[in-house]
């Protein structure tokens, strides 16, 4: 009997430790706002429908990757520096916050985002052309279906010959160099030499240090 109780205590302690470790590993953006996720929010519904984990304000997969973020009614004027931790999110709710109008660069890198819920007076990042559907309600605005603008007419021509267009978030594009090319306009061929880069950086730093040392010595002698 004592053995069973001892085993049960160990199991409970192990579960407690695992729970603490999971809590400690929770991304900071998930606890930006006190309390848990709103039960009737679209993020909570998505999390339940896909059998994902709900922790604080986040919906996570088994690896701890953020798939949903519910920061509605958090008195946020700006999503903050940790918002980038949610770049893997598929759905984000920011309604009922006094956000600033321009959020274009806030969502740079959010290439997986498919549903974004904003205050009614805040436009969808990238404008209506960056989304399949933009729906306005009395208290919120919903941006759905992020478009890949690289597929739009004329967009691929913005990249050089050895580069290709890639989405970088709602309404945002970037040029990615093809394999074997790098540098300005992807014109340099071959692998990027880290040894050469750090060699040049080290030489430049050494030269500046010697120059500053010489200047200080001359000032010291003059005084």
Swiss-Prot record:
Any one biological process term the GO annotation gives: positive regulation of osteoblast differentiation
Q: Where is the signal peptide?
A: 1-25
Q: Where in the cell is it found?
A: Nucleus envelope; Cell membrane; Lysosome membrane
Decide whether keyword Signal is in the record: yes
The GO cellular component terms are: lysosomal membrane; nuclear envelope; perinuclear region of cytoplasm; plasma membrane
Q: Which domain of life is it from?
A: Eukaryota
What residues form the membrane-spanning segments? 194-214
Q: Name one GO molecular function term.
A: xenobiotic transmembrane transporter activity
Residues in the Cytoplasmic compartment per record: 215-223
**Disulfide cysteine pairs (residue numbers):** 150-165, 159-175, 177-186
On subunit structure and binding partners, the annotation says: Interacts with NELL1; the interaction promotes osteoblastic differentiation and mineralization. Interacts with SLC37A3; the interaction is direct and both proteins are mutually dependent for their stability.
Function field: Promotes osteoblast cell differentiation and terminal mineralization. Plays a role in inducing the cell cycle arrest via inhibiting CCND1 expression in all-trans-retinoic acid (ATRA) signal pathway. In osteoclasts, forms a transporter complex with ATRAID for nitrogen-containing-bisphophonates (N-BPs) required for releasing N-BP molecules that have trafficked to lysosomes through fluid-phase endocytosis into the cytosol.
PANTHER family per the record?
ALL-TRANS RETINOIC ACID-INDUCED DIFFERENTIATION FACTOR (PTHR15926:SF1)
Task: Return the protein name.
Answer: All-trans retinoic acid-induced differentiation factor
Gene name? Atraid
